[in-house]
Amino acid sequence: MKKNTGFDSGIEKLARKTASKTGRRSFIGKLGGFLVGSALLPLLPVDRRGRMNEAHAETKGVLGREGYKPQDKDPKSCDYWRHCSIDGNLCDCCGGSLTSCPPGTELSPSSWVASCFNPGDGQTYLIAYRDCCGKQTCGRCNCVNVQGELPVYRPEFNNDIVWCFGADNDAMTYHCTVSPIVGKAS
């Protein structure tokens, strides 16, 4: 048998000292906690509001940010002021209205919010977009406006999520979106 070198004997002493002071179960428990904690770290919420002015969202949809000029005359148009951050079919074109779902659909209990400028009175209003669920997608008046949209890690400000979860009677199928005013934002 070869004689241990200084490095080997140092590691052996450290291992024996650690083994005499800690039990195997304690070590395995701490190791397991560390591994689980490391795996769950990316799931923690991230708030990046301080860097919002650096965000450059991709311009997509019917109207780009540069060309978006809200109007207050035609609620069935994608540039109607209440639709500044809508992503989906307007219920106005599907048998409903700005604030009510078409017959045969149910209002989702969840919503996403945006603040939209009304050119008619010069005020900014808080809009709580809510999906109407329970029928197949309407497919008329599809608008994809991204003004004020934030990434999915801020879901209450993201319009890419189908908000039909939580609807009664398992009505999880998206049909259209309503745009009720919650109050003044300014």
UniProtKB/Swiss-Prot annotation:
Electron transport among keywords: yes
Record's comment on post-translational modification: Predicted to be exported by the Tat system. The position of the signal peptide cleavage has not been experimentally proven. Tryptophan tryptophylquinone (TTQ) is formed by oxidation of the indole ring of a tryptophan to form tryptophylquinone followed by covalent cross-linking with another tryptophan residue.
Pfam families membership: Me-amine-dh_L (PF02975)
GO-annotated biological processes: amine metabolic process
Domain of life: Bacteria
SUPFAM superfamilies registered for this protein in UniProt: Methylamine dehydrogenase, L chain (SSF57561)
Enzymatic reactions: 2 oxidized [amicyanin] + methylamine + H2O = 2 reduced [amicyanin] + formaldehyde + NH4(+) + 2 H(+)
GO molecular function, one term: aliphatic amine dehydrogenase activity
CC annotations in GO: outer membrane-bounded periplasmic space
Bridged cysteine pairs (disulfide): C78-C143, C84-C116, C91-C176, C93-C141, C101-C132, C133-C164
Pathway participation: One-carbon metabolism; methylamine degradation; formaldehyde from methylamine: step 1/1
Residues recorded as bearing Tryptophylquinone in the entry: W112
Main localization category: periplasm
EC supergroup of this enzyme: oxidoreductase
Cofactor mode of binding and number, as noted: Uses a protein-derived tryptophan tryptophylquinone (TTQ) cofactor.
Enzyme Commission code(s) on record: 1.4.9.1
Cross-link (Tryptophan tryptophylquinone (Trp-Trp)): W112-W163
Keyword Nucleus: no
Subunit text: Heterotetramer of two light and two heavy chains.
Function, in words: Methylamine dehydrogenase carries out the oxidation of methylamine. Electrons are passed from methylamine dehydrogenase to amicyanin.
Family per similarity comment: Belongs to the aromatic amine dehydrogenase light chain family.
Record-given protein name: Methylamine dehydrogenase light chain
Organism, scientific name: Methylobacillus flagellatus (strain ATCC 51484 / DSM 6875 / VKM B-1610 / KT)
Gene: mauA
